[in-house]
From Swiss-Prot:
A GO cellular component entry from the record: periplasmic space
A Pfam family per the record: PD40
Protein's organism: Dinoroseobacter shibae (strain DSM 16493 / NCIMB 14021 / DFL 12)
Main location (coarse class): periplasm
GO term, biological process aspect, one: cell division
Signal peptide: 1-24
Organism lineage string: Bacteria, Pseudomonadati, Pseudomonadota, Alphaproteobacteria, Rhodobacterales
Quaternary context: The Tol-Pal system is composed of five core proteins: the inner membrane proteins TolA, TolQ and TolR, the periplasmic protein TolB and the outer membrane protein Pal. They form a network linking the inner and outer membranes and the peptidoglycan layer.
Entry's family note: Belongs to the TolB family.
Name by which UniProt lists this protein: Tol-Pal system protein TolB
Presence of the UniProt keyword Cell division in the record: yes
Subcellular location, record wording: Periplasm
Function summary: Part of the Tol-Pal system, which plays a role in outer membrane invagination during cell division and is important for maintaining outer membrane integrity.
Amino acid sequence: MKRAFLSALSVGLAALFLTGPAQAQGNPGPLRIEITEGVIEPLPIAVPPFLAETPAASQFARDIAQVVADDLEGSGLFRAIPENAFISPITSFDSPVQYADWKAINAQALVTGSVSVASDGRLVVKFRLFDVFSDAPLGKGLQFVASQSSWRRMGHKVADAVYSRITGEGGYFDSRVVFVSETGPKNARQKRLAIMDYDGANVQFLTDSSAIVLAPRFSPTGDRVLYTSYATGRPQITLLDVNSVRSQGLGSAQGGEMSFAPRFSPDGRSVVFSLTNGGNSDIYRRDLSSGAQTRLTATPAIETAPSFSPDGRQIVFESDRSGSQQLYVMSATGGEARRISFGPGRYGTPVWSPRGDLIAFTKQNQGRFHIGVMRTDGSEERLLTSSFLDESPTWSPNGRVIMFTRETSGAGGAPSLYSVDISGRNLRRVPTPGAASDPAWSPLLP
């Protein structure tokens, strides 16, 4: 862990820089968490309840501050100091910070904020971040303006800004997750697409339970979702508009063909997927505008689960062409593939990190399932989890956290969503209303 100055960050939701007495004054605070070195002791941070500047903002002020504290603590990098430990309350957003009182309770960072309801009914949220031990603000304050229904997003935006200033990396709190919501007995599950905030709040269903759905994936802009649907009786790739909740089959499968495991290209213009015909599965690429389809692999093996590199030049996929299920990387235009997994066991469901540096995967070995990561050349393999059944990894927008499905054993076993950071620490269950599987993390919301 280091202490180093970070400059102010500009973010959306009608964000404005604040000016005033607490603005950065040329005395930069050197507070910083260096994530790559591994964080064992979370950084103590104080997030007092935000001040309500208008009577109607009272509950929003407390709730938004709680979202900020929960986001930061949930990352595993911070430890929120309980409110009953505070020595001096924050009574004015513009009053000078009493650094000695925060040092006395070992707070290394302090987040202050205020909330008001404007004449047009919108919420106005202001916040500042302070490096307590340097007696200085960390960058300029920010102000967000949005509808009252967006109050949780405003909390996530504040938390993302704090995370970014202290770690030097992008946040991931203002994002959503699409997943498969499951109900019913294990041998007759009903499956629906659902979407929620990254932390399990605001669950909404995108499909009904009339057809089984699998493997949803967000578009790069987060406004569309690809998934596999059994509405026609056989698996078919379907494209859903998140805002209108309208879906359409991409219609590539014919006769006895089955198409599944779709994923967008980084530019959102094409899709890679598996197509099975006559018992042989290969990987194809489809242009979404023209419908033109290109076969990328042509072997007798089962080849599936393709995932683009962030630059769109390569594809990682799973194949049993060597006799067991392993991971391969090939050009995005097809051609010769190189094997990158060589450890014991079987590897599957590879997903390229949005940072481009790692590939997440599922591994089965000696009766256990694992979520792991490796370099894109297959080196430095690390297993992050181990259980009866862990599968379906998906990356947070900043490439620092992986969400996945964990299913318990036995007749009553059911899947749940979990997250873990890429060091293998901070394993957490993501709350969902019922059984849930196949998570897919969106990019940061605009």
